[in-house]
Amino acid sequence: MLTIQEFCFNAFQENTYILYNEHKEAIIIDPGCYTRMEQKMLTDFISTQQLTPTLLLNTHCHLDHVFGNNFISTTYQLAAHFHPNEQIVLDRLPEAAAKWGVATEPYIGPVQYIQQNEIISFGKDSFKVLLTPG
């Protein structure tokens, strides 16, 4: 059985999700945790639930969805997974942040691209990647 935990992070009110199964495996989706307090909220939940994050997934790479990528990648030794069309958006993160008047560092962790119709396995469950640009 899959469970979803939602967090609302950063000044943009971005939704971050932790999807986890009965085996305590977790996927972190769009980690928008910007402050240390938000990072602690996320890691405290993961620790309290005794979860093991296995995947960092970005639905897209707008700044509010990737503020926590470096933190999650470093903390849990995970690569960021996203569609290759989002690489240019991620590369422009510092510029986009400056336009909004927020400070952030470029993402420096590993990247793994996901493709249209790719299957992501997660315990007994699997998900099909659907490209929904726009």
Give the role of each language-model region.
Residues 18, 117-134:
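Core dinuclear metal-dependent hydrolase active-site scaffold
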Residues 34-123:
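Active-site HxH/HxHxD metal-binding segment of metal-dependent hydrolases
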Residues 28, 64, 129-130:
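Short glycine- and Lys/Arg-enriched binding-loop motifs that mark or flank ligand-binding interfaces
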Residues 25-27, 55, 125:
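Structural motif
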Residues 1-49:
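Conserved beta-strand hairpin/beta-sheet module of binuclear metal-dependent hydrolase folds
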